[in-house]
Amino acid sequence: MSGANDIPRQLIVLGDSGVHGWGDREAGGWCQRLRLRWMNLPSAPVVYPLGVRGDGLEHVAARWRREWCCRGELRRQTPGGLLLSVGLNDTARVGRIDGRPQLDVEAFSFGLGQLLNEMTQEMQVFVLGLTAVDEHVMPFAGCLWYANSQIAAMEAVMAEQCREADVPFLSMHQEMQEQSDWLTWMEPDGIHLNADGHRWLDQRLDQWAPLRDWAGLAPYNTSTPISM
């Protein structure tokens, strides 16, 4: 057991089924891959994955503080960092392809701005962008329509709010679609990543300089290509 004086920094990872690792039957998801990689580095922060399937911005905003303030070693100190990965569920349109979104872009932008303002007063915050979806297999669960145009609009306001809050932001949506085989990274439901998708996201995250710098890791060797 660790002593009271040698508790490492913690990285809280908050979000939805992506954080949970849904779809990755090989390694448990990109967050689990990150956790295991850092576990093998003695000086790296401890990763706490706190993803809940179906969560959107409002759900995360309601639970983010109580997730860590009363748990184990976390109840005695504020975590050093928080990685936020949420928003895809908010883009879904309900009932039909032109139905109302779970949360419209303006409301999402306002809510994210408020949430980042709260979070950044307590810890270093990082934000992940949104992954693409396979529109051809919609609707999800028979009633939710996801569209890449809506996801792109949502990610754009995420980037804007992060710039205003001076929070590192890692875009995902366009970068994912630029990969020729990205559709093979999807689960049959069209919204969740499979093991290959989680691997790509994890490798992209591993190269992200702001997170590596905060974690005290050496700069990524850019001569090493991403392999699938």
Which residues are covered by each model-predicted region?
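Alpha-helical cap/lid subdomain in secreted, periplasmic
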Residues: D6-I7, M39-S43, A61-M228
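Serine-esterase "nucleophile elbow" of acetyl-processing enzymes
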Residues: M1-R53, E58-H59, R65-T78, L82
